[in-house]
Amino acid sequence: MYETIQTPFNYGGLTLKNRIIFAPTTFGLSDEDYFEKIRRIAAGGCAMIIVGDVPVGKSHFGKSLFDKKGFAFYEKVIGIAHDNDCKVCAQLHQSDSNIKAMLKYVPGVLTKRISMQELRPLLNNEVAPYITNMPHKKVKEITSAFGTAAVLAKKAGFDMIQIHGDRMCGSFSSSIYNHRTDEYGGTVENRARFAVEAVSAVREKLPDMPIDYKLAVRQENPHYGNAGVIEDELRVFVPMLEKAGVTSFHVTLANHSDLENTIPPKNHPYFSEPGCFLKFCDEVRQYTNLPICGVGGLTDPDFMEKQLADGRIQCAAMSRQLLADPDWVNKLKDGHADQIHRCVRCNKKCLGGLMQHQGTHCIY
């Protein structure tokens, strides 16, 4: 059983031992707890871990490949995964948060007058002016930095690069946030330029490196997500990314709204069904033959086997389910699917724990 899930696959130039990927996840843990979490997930049998939010420059808020301590941190993460026969992908990103704007909210957060739930919309309101008014020279510096960061990622031992198509790439892509009047704004082609240049910078530096693109799709009617591109714009956006050097797509809903839209609980009014974002994969498939990884509400091995066997997606990414049971893949392999701890999509200790500064965990 579950033959397709367990079949090796060439995902955008990288051979994976099976079709299961650990989706990029913010943990909010100490280094040692983070290393242990990575070890458990890798040992559980997934083919690749995507390490989320690897900055393309020096960072004030987290680990960076651009300093010795951060570089060593990523080397250790990679070593732990590789020791467990698990590939590792670096999700390169550039935040679209205006640091100066963020600082004015720090006192309120520290005194708890502003909750994390209240902070998010405040920061989102700062995105449009930040993106729209960013100096042309700064834009070029950032897109070029993706290439520099990719070289460091390869040196550290990462097997694949993923360009984070939400964050700044997504905000430049979005007509909601991008009101520029130069070559980076206006038409779909112009709004895609930032992302295309980021991909091109990586491809120029690393001609043979597999490049995954986290493609953030904005839905209308009803409206969900603010960054990224709307479905009708995929016909322009997807071929441009492929031409620039993307070798696979990781397709999901655009962010910059309520986190429970992009990490939907079981009682979500619109995204409650298994594989809740796979319809966006169907849209992307119309414009590319590259491998597509689906994500969102994937917990049931029977459902996932069918999607993979039918060719709807080529890989399946999970975060909450592998937090609930890191041994998901091994249990399938050993014929013990009935023993899997199923994620119930309650968001209590994963998203809930993160928002309460207690780290990302699970009720199990």
Predicted feature locations:
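Flavin-dependent oxidoreductase catalytic cores
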Residues: M1-Y364
